[in-house]
Each structure stands twice: as C-alpha cells, then as structure tokens.
C-alpha cells in the first residue's frame, strides 16, 4: 500500500507549534498540493483556515485539537495517525457565498463555512430588509444583527444567538436575528439550502452595518446577498464515533 501523503498545518498556538516538527519527522511532510490529506493542528480556527484554502479542490482535512474551541477537531494523539485517518468518517460541508455591496458601490465577495453575519457598527440599532428568493419577507427588522448559518455553523455564533441547531445532513440554513427589538418576538426562520437571501440595510449612511463571512469583514455595507455555493464541497474527517452529526446531537442535550 502506498504510504499516505500528509501535509501538516499548525496554528500559532505554542502547543501546536511544539508538536509540528515532531509529526513531520515521524510521518514526513508534503505540500498541501501534493498531499492526500491535510492535518490541521490547533483549534477550530486552524480547521477553518485550512478549509478556506481548499475551497477549489475540497481536499480532506483531519484536525487534531491543540487549541481552545475544538468542535471540528479530533483528540490529539501523535501515534497511529495514518491508521486514524484511514478509518475516519467523512463529513461533507457546503460553504456559503457572500456578495456585499458597500456604500461606495464596491462589490466584495467572500466564502463562509459557519455563517455570514451582519452587525451594527455603532450604538444605533441596525434596520434590515429581508428578501428570500425574490420575495420580501420582512420590510424592517430592528436588531443588533442578523446571520445566515450552515448546519456546521449552527452550533457556533448561531447557537449563542439562540438559533436552532441543524443536523449536519439537513438541507437547511438558519436565518437568526441578534437581539431583535422589532418584531420583538421574531426568532428567525429555517430556509432551504438552495435559498437566496438578500438583506438590504435601511438608512445605511445613518445606521452603518458590517458584514462578515466567518472572520472576513466588510464595513459600511448597503446590501448583502447570501447563497450556498453548490460548486464547492469541503471534506472534514472525524474519528469513528465522534463524527460531526454525533457532536451536533450531543450539543442539543448539553446543559
């Protein structure tokens, strides 16, 4: 059997940087383009950084937890890494595509794995108009912000904003407000994964709003369009019994 070609990527955390040369000495090291699989060392940030670099080819990524938050990571063990990778279960993720137009008319494009969020930039609340598949669903939402979250991202910022947790295989997106003031009782909506969401900022010159695709931010926006990108799929590997759908299920029973 041909040895597994592994590329290693480590976050800047000391724990990850410390084990990086040891793993390269033990298993060899290839560039990400040459490798069969990429091993990300750190927390979820390291995993997201690695996945963003693989938007075009969807090369599988296996994460080992040496950071803070590790929802997308496996436990760290230096031994038996090729065997763990070969036995791993695969989760396929579909990223979101954001097109944000700022007040100057400049169009910014970015991709997100977890969520695309809009947030007020000042002490004044944001006022947002929500359009789904060309139909106005809400003329004005007064809030601190609004997000569109994927199933993989539903346990992150979306959950903190009291949004629903989505099973990883669900063909759904969560549309979740952040501190909605009016309508006060609105808690968001579930949308089909193929939905196109247009969000227009009401009075953007007086109530500025930023838009973020995961951690990539655009400020002073006038309009944002969010869609799932069907042409791109990302592959994340998990140890047996610890796959992403199981983690999401456990999260729903956590107190």
Swiss-Prot record:
Annotated catalysed reactions: NAD(+) + ATP = ADP + NADP(+) + H(+)
A Pfam entry, by short name: NAD_kinase_C
Signal peptide: none
Primary location class: cytoplasm
Enzyme class at the top of the EC tree: transferase
Domain of life: Bacteria
Cofactors (names): a divalent metal cation
Localisation per UniProt entry: Cytoplasm
Residue positions of the active site: 44 (proton acceptor)
Gene Ontology annotations for the cellular component aspect, listed alphabetically: cytoplasm
One Gene Ontology molecular-function label: NAD binding
SUPFAM superfamilies to which the protein is assigned, alphabetical: NAD kinase/diacylglycerol kinase-like (SSF111331)
EC number(s) recorded for this UniProt protein: 2.7.1.23
Residues holding NAD(+): 44-45, 114-115, 144, 152, 155-160
Keyword Thylakoid among record annotations: no
Gene Ontology biological process terms, A to Z: NAD metabolic process; NADP biosynthetic process
Keywords: ATP-binding, Cytoplasm, Kinase, NAD, NADP, Nucleotide-binding, Transferase
Alphabetical list of HAMAP family matching this protein: NAD_kinase (MF_00361)
Family indicated by similarity: Belongs to the NAD kinase family.
Described function: Involved in the regulation of the intracellular balance of NAD and NADP, and is a key enzyme in the biosynthesis of NADP. Catalyzes specifically the phosphorylation on 2'-hydroxyl of the adenosine moiety of NAD to yield NADP.
Protein name stated in the entry: NAD kinase
Species whose genome carries this gene: Hyphomonas neptunium (strain ATCC 15444)
């Amino acid at each position: 059997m041909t040895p597994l070609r592994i590329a290693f990527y480590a976050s800047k955390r000391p724990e990850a940087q410390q084990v990086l040369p040891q793993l390269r000495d033990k298993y060899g090291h290839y560039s990400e383009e040459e490798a069969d699989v990429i091993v990300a060392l750190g927390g979820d940030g390291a995993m997201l950084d690695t996945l963003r670099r693989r938007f075009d080819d969807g090369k599988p990524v296996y994460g080992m937890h040496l950071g803070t938050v590790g929802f997308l990571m496996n436990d760290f063990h230096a031994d038996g890494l090729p065997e763990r990778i070969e036995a791993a279960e695969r989760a396929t993720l579909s990223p979101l595509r954001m097109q944000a137009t700022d007040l100057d008319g400049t169009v910014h494009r970015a991709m997100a794995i977890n969520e695309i969020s809009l947030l007020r930039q000042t002490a004044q609340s944001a006022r947002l108009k929500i359009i789904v598949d060309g139909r106005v669903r809400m003329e004005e939402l007064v809030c601190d912000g609004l997000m569109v979250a994927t199933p993989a991202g539903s346990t992150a910022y979306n959950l903190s904003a009291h949004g629903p947790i989505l099973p990883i295989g669900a063909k759904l997106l969560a549309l979740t407000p952040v501190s909605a003031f009016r309508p006060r009782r609105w808690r968001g909506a579930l949308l089909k994964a193929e939905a196109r969401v247009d969000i227009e900022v009401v009075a953007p010159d007086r109530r500025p709003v930023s838009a973020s695709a995961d951690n990539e931010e655009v400020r002073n926006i006038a309009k944002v369009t969010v869609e799932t990108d069907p042409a791109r799929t990302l592959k994340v590997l998990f140890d047996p019994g610890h796959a992403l759908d199981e983690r999401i299920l456990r999260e729903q029973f956590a107190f």
